[in-house]
Amino acid sequence: MEKFPAVTVFDLDYQGRGVAKIDGQVVFIEGALPDETVTFCKTSAKKQFIEAVVDEIIEPSPQRVAPRCPFYDRCGGCALQHWHSQEQLLGKQKLWLTQLQRLGGAQPEHVLLPLAGKEWRYRRRARLAVHYENDVIAVGFKAKRSHDVVAVNDCLILQEHLAAALPLLPDFLRALLPVKVDEILLTAGEKVAALTLRTKKRALSPAWGEKWANLAGAHWQLWENDRCLFGEPNDLYYQPISGVTLHFTPDDFIQVNASVNEALIQTVLAWLAPLEKSEVLDLFSGLGNFSLPLAYKGARVTAVEGVRAMVQRGAKMAAEQQLSSRLEMQCMDLFSVSAAQMKSWQSAKSWLLDPPRAGAHAVVQALPKKFPEKIVYVSCNPATLARDVAILQSKGFHLERGQVVNMFAHSAHIESVILMTRTI
């Protein structure tokens, strides 16, 4: 790789890379922090910028720390372990506010302190790569800037009982041969954990589940693709709030950080208060991470989700927990919303949006200028959030408050939540 002379880093980008300039050209430098002087090696060159990796740190930032993970230099799983955890939070908040202002022309009236939880051993879900070469089976994560697999026997951001499975997997996969596994999912509920093996066809017998449980512990399930081979599927659940149980499968989307998710739910409940007998519309509701707690707290909730299987299972959970009278589940495509559909939701004065990374563009574009009165928006992408906030401001909404949610400690991903209230 081509080496370049020293530059001073003046910012951080949304991928956690240091930003510098050389001869007027922007350079994104993996592994560099703001205010550091570094030399770098070019990894790729575009017309308007250079991508690079740190070669030598000449003047380190006082915020730099030694990464805890022995695989950090090679593994692509974490991006920010070399940055003090408190500074990570402040840096994410700064980047989030910059995105809101630059892309959305918006600034929250009240910027709350970041919502944070455990920094280590917090992830209850992980996707593992597998590579077979001769007699060696590598199980781990994709390498930085590569599709190579970095074999790991621990992961410091995984919950302990999930991480404990890592050193057991290569030998277990070797025993499965000639069946080969393309990918592995590790998922933790409150009672059991699940090992999911992605194979090209259903090739495994339930006996392998018992063998895995004998190896890893009785609290494990074994799944092959979407089929539970060992254990009771209904045992895989979490409680978003006390009194509410949400059952899920390994393929379902759930927030990876249990403690931060619980804190986020409490924030959403507080911002949508008063809830007793109020009407709330929950868009992009998934299995009911927010809508089940909202109904439990007394709100009348209409929850809308695009995946029919999730809607059906959410409705089943509502019925099992005697919440059906306060929770209606609807299935529709929220990336194409009609005026007639909007009108059918007008009785709900409070709306909750929790879209995927693409944001809620179709919803906010179709929003009339009469309702709702307030919107709580949970975002996993500052760029699409800023775009949607700009549209909402043009329709009479005020960005009252917001905060970064540190759902993904040591990664560059930014989760956030905002409250917008109608002013006209």
UniProtKB/Swiss-Prot annotation:
EC identifiers of the protein:
2.1.1.190
- Which residues act catalytically here? C380
Does the keyword field hold S-adenosyl-L-methionine?
Answer: yes
Entry keyword Transferase: yes
Checking InterPro entries in the record gives: 23S_rRNA_MeTrfase_RlmD (IPR001566), MeTrfase_TrmA_AS (IPR030390), NA-bd_OB-fold (IPR012340), SAM-dependent_MTases_sf (IPR029063), TRAM_dom (IPR002792), U5_MeTrfase_fam (IPR010280)
BP-aspect Gene Ontology terms: rRNA base methylation
User: Taxonomically, which superkingdom?
Assistant: Bacteria
Annotated residues for binding of S-adenosyl-L-methionine: Q255, F284, N289, E305, D333, D354
Give start and end of each TRAM domain: 1-56
A single MF term (Gene Ontology): RNA binding
Under catalytic activity, the entry for this protein gives: uridine(1939) in 23S rRNA + S-adenosyl-L-methionine = 5-methyluridine(1939) in 23S rRNA + S-adenosyl-L-homocysteine + H(+)
Keywords per UniProt: 4Fe-4S, Iron, Iron-sulfur, Metal-binding, Methyltransferase, rRNA processing, S-adenosyl-L-methionine, Transferase
Q: Binding residues for [4Fe-4S] cluster, per the UniProt record?
A: C69, C75, C78, C155
What is this enzyme's class at the first EC digit?
A: transferase
Described by its record, this protein's role is as follows: Catalyzes the formation of 5-methyl-uridine at position 1939 (m5U1939) in 23S rRNA.
Which HAMAP family does the record cross-reference, listed alphabetically? 23SrRNA_methyltr_RlmD (MF_01010)
**Could you say which protein family the record assigns here?**
Belongs to the class I-like SAM-binding methyltransferase superfamily. RNA M5U methyltransferase family. RlmD subfamily.
Q: What name is this protein filed under?
A: 23S rRNA (uracil(1939)-C(5))-methyltransferase RlmD
Q: Which organism is it from?
A: Dichelobacter nodosus (strain VCS1703A)
Gene from which the chain derives: rlmD
